[in-house]
A protein has these predicted regions:
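Membrane-interface amphipathic segments in extracytoplasmic regions
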Residues: 1-243
Length: 243
């Protein structure tokens, strides 16, 4: 998490939304400095310790199409991004999350690298219930959301919201290797597309993302929305109190 007392803003780092690059840029050129820990939540981590005047600061964060995140996850494991998967280490923060993420990384490495899973095999195995991130907790109440798909234009708009002029575009950092196509092209078969509609449909609708028009022959099943609501009850409890 990044805070600037000079410009009165807080940047909440949602994972896999270019948050590292944005945070680095805010620290370099917009008087930001680190507070709490990287992926701290605004409502449960920041507000508990914030001073009254800090609670009035503008709040910005990021967002990214989860279909893109899924493809990126696959290639990060396949290329052993930053040796994160061949030599997994515990995260520094989180009550349960650090153990869950280490288990997840080990499992994906064995399946993708050692067993040679394709993207579709990985997607079918690893994604079984409708997707959500902890953006569902508080992003709707934030002052501006920077979309990964429109990164530099949205970053410029976010800076306007907090009242500062843009110095430059965000330098590319932490880029995933080996991706050679638009992310939705990796969902090649109708089987993968149906799975994607079930897994991502409710989240995409919530955040005004669209599936490709060429997928219109496949509908998001009604029970996906029911499962999304049910699973999110447990997710919110985990993210707020157990992670």
């Amino acid at each position: 998490m990044i805070i600037s007392h000079k410009h009165k803003y807080v940047f909440v780092e949602l994972p896999q939304t270019a948050s590292s690059a944005i945070a680095k840029e805010l620290k370099a050129n917009y008087d930001g400095h680190e507070i709490l820990f990287k992926h701290a939540l605004y409502s449960t981590d920041f507000l508990k310790q914030a001073k009254p005047e800090e609670k009035a600061y503008k709040v910005i964060s990021g967002m990214r199409n989860p279909m893109d995140i899924c493809v990126s996850n696959y290639f990060k494991v396949k290329t052993d991004h930053e040796n994160r998967y061949s030599n997994p280490r515990l995260m520094q923060h989180g009550f349960l999350r650090k153990y869950i993420m280490r288990w997840w990384n080990v499992r994906q490495y064995k399946s993708i690298v050692e067993k040679g899973e394709t993207f579709e095999q990985f997607f079918t195995r690893a994604y079984s219930v409708p997707y959500a991130s902890w953006s569902i907790i508080e992003h709707k109440r934030m002052d501006f959301i920077i979309r990964f798909e429109n990164l530099n234009d949205d970053f410029a708009q976010a800076l306007k919201v907090i009242g500062v002029d843009k110095v430059r575009d965000i330098p590319v950092a932490n880029k995933t290797a080996e991706k050679t196509k638009t992310f939705w092209e990796y969902y090649e078969t109708d089987t993968a597309k149906r799975r994607a509609k079930y897994i991502f449909g409710p989240y995409l609708k919530r955040w005004d993302y669209d599936f490709p028009e060429s997928w219109n022959h496949i509908q998001v099943p009604w029970y996906s929305f029911f499962m999304y609501r049910m699973v999110n009850i447990a997710r919110v409890i985990f993210w707020k109190f157990l992670r």
